[in-house]
Structure formats: C-alpha cells, structure tokens
A protein has these predicted regions:
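Charge-rich, low-complexity N-terminal segments
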Residues: 1-41, 84, 92
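Charged, low-complexity, helix/coiled-coil-prone segments
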Residues: 7-22, 55-73, 147
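Hydrophobic residues embedded in beta-strands of well-ordered beta-sheets
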Residues: 30, 49-51, 98-100
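A generic beta-sheet turn/junction motif
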Residues: 34-35, 46-48, 95
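A short acidic-to-branched-hydrophobic micro-motif
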Residues: 40-61
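Short, internal acidic amphipathic alpha-helical interface segments
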Residues: 55-99, 103
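Ampiphathic alpha-helical segments that act as solvent-exposed interaction surfaces
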Residues: 70-79, 105-139
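Short, highly charged C-terminal tails/helix-capping segments
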Residues: 135-155
Length: 155
C-alpha cells in the first residue's frame, strides 16, 4: 500500500468513526484526533507495527467478519494474533466493528504481538460490555482444546 493510499484509507476510517482529523507525524505514521483534545497514535516504526495499523483500518472498512479473517490469514505476523486470541471467533458485524474501534484506540506504536495481547487483556479486565464479550471469547477459545480432547476420549 502506498503512502497516499494509506492516508486516503485513514481518512475514510476517520470519517466513519467521527474522528476529527488525521495527520502525518515525523515518523511517517499517523495520529487520529478523536474529540479535539485526545489524540491516538497509529504511528509505526517497524513493519509489524504498520501491519497492525493496517489490519485495524482494513477491518474497519470490511463488510463482515469473514473478510477480517481473510485479511488475517494473508500475513503470518497477523495470523499469530488469530491463533493466540479471538479474531477467528467474531460472530457478527456489530461486534466486529466494536472490537476494531477498541483496537484503533490502542497505541500500537512499537507493540510486539506479546505487548499487544497484554494490552488487550488489560482492556478486557476493565469489564465493559465489549471487553466482557472479548473475555468470553478468549475463555471459549482456551477451553476448545480441552473439549476436543474430552470428545476424543469418549470416541
């Protein structure tokens, strides 16, 4: 994705999320103005950071969760998130969009997969409706191997 296309995508996302302004920063990344006083960085200094930003932005514009899963599978770095967490379990568009908004509000600058997942865990522990739903998905995903093992023992 070219810098110009990336900036156009960010502006589309900004309009969709009622973000007031998008600006380029010194690092070549971007910051989003949410309410005139609070800025959220989507700057990146590594290819991984850039991919995380791009995932959030593309997912926001995706028509459904299946598209998000497709995007996740296109890149090995991002696929690690799917394997470790909740992306493959997103059931509908509204929950999907709520999660993407939450992800966009994370400062992804210099985040490794481990740090990103720790930050998601911290969000989940605060207990809002979307975050509680994420926790439920995480628990379901963690319980899945045990359920498969039990089913295999019964067979």
């Amino acid at each position: 994705m070219t810098q110009q296309a990336y900036e156009a995508l960010l502006n589309d996302v900004a309009a969709a999320l009622d973000i007031e302004r998008v600006e380029t920063d010194k690092s070549g990344g971007f910051v989003l103005e949410l309410d005139g006083s609070r800025w959220v960085s989507v700057a990146y200094s590594t290819p991984e950071d850039k991919l995380m930003c791009q995932l959030c932005l593309e997912a926001t514009l995706s028509p459904d969760a299946e598209t998000l899963r497709y995007l996740l599978r296109q890149n090995q770095f991002i696929a690690e998130y799917e394997q470790q967490h909740f992306f493959s379990l997103i059931p509908d568009i509204q929950q999907h969009n709520n999660i993407v908004v939450a992800l966009l509000r994370l400062p992804v600058h210099n985040m490794t997969p481990k740090i990103f997942l720790q930050e998601v865990d911290r969000m989940v522990s605060r207990g809002t409706a979307v975050e509680s739903w994420l926790l439920q998905l995480k628990e379901q995903k963690e319980a899945a191997p045990a359920a498969i093992e039990q089913a295999a023992l019964k067979a």
